[in-house]
């Protein structure tokens, strides 16, 4: 009976000591994995940041192209009221006081030259 107790005690001590070693190893593995995970996250974050910077550069480039090609001021079409001091009539039109049918209106209109 003593041999059974000694054997059981020996197996118990080995299990506890190996179990703690496994626990320490598991803790070390978890730390390594979290460190690797952090490095992967840093890598992914840097990659995402680069992509966002490229997108931003493209968008800013498109904005600058649009501003170069866009009209500075919109022009006023034919028969539309205009300001006598600041005419914005389209090319080929002149800001004039209306004749005949529009004489009761006190504003100027864009007419063909």
Curated annotation (Swiss-Prot):
* Family of this protein: Belongs to the neurotoxin 14 (magi-1) family. 01 (HNTX-16) subfamily.
Where is the protein situated, by its record's location annotation? Secreted
The organs and tissues expressing this protein are described as: Expressed by the venom gland.
GO MF annotations, alphabetized: sodium channel inhibitor activity; toxin activity
Signal peptide per UniProt: 1-21
Q: Which organism is it from?
A: Cyriopagopus hainanus
Propeptide stretches in the record: 22-74
Per UniProt, the keywords (alphabetical) are: Disulfide bond, Ion channel impairing toxin, Knottin, Secreted, Signal, Toxin
The organism's superkingdom is given as Eukaryota
Is Disulfide bond there in the keyword field? Answer: yes
Coiled-coil blocks: none
Keyword Signal (UniProt) = yes
| Record's protein name | U11-theraphotoxin-Hhn1a
Please report any disulfide bonds recorded for this protein chain, giving both cysteine positions: 75-90, 82-95, 89-110
What function does the entry list?
A: Probable ion channel inhibitor.
Question: Could you state one GO cellular component term attached to this entry?
Answer: extracellular region
Q: What is the lineage of its organism?
A: Eukaryota, Metazoa, Ecdysozoa, Arthropoda, Chelicerata
Q: What is known of its domains?
A: The presence of a 'disulfide through disulfide knot' structurally defines this protein as a knottin.
Concerning InterPro entries, the annotation shows:
Toxin_22 (IPR012627)
A single Pfam family, by name? Toxin_22
């Amino acid at each position: 009976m003593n041999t059974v107790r000694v054997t059981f005690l020996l197996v118990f001590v080995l299990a506890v000591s190996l179990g703690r070693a496994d626990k320490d190893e598991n803790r070390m593995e978890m730390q390594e994995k979290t460190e690797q995970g952090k490095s992967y996250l840093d890598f992914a974050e840097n990659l995402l940041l680069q992509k966002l910077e490229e997108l931003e550069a493209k968008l800013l480039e498109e904005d600058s192209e649009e501003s170069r090609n866009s009209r500075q001021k919109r022009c006023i079409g034919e028969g539309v009221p205009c300001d006598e001091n600041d005419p914005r009539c389209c090319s080929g039109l002149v800001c004039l006081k209306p004749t005949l049918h529009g004489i009761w209106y006190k504003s100027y209109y864009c007419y063909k030259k």
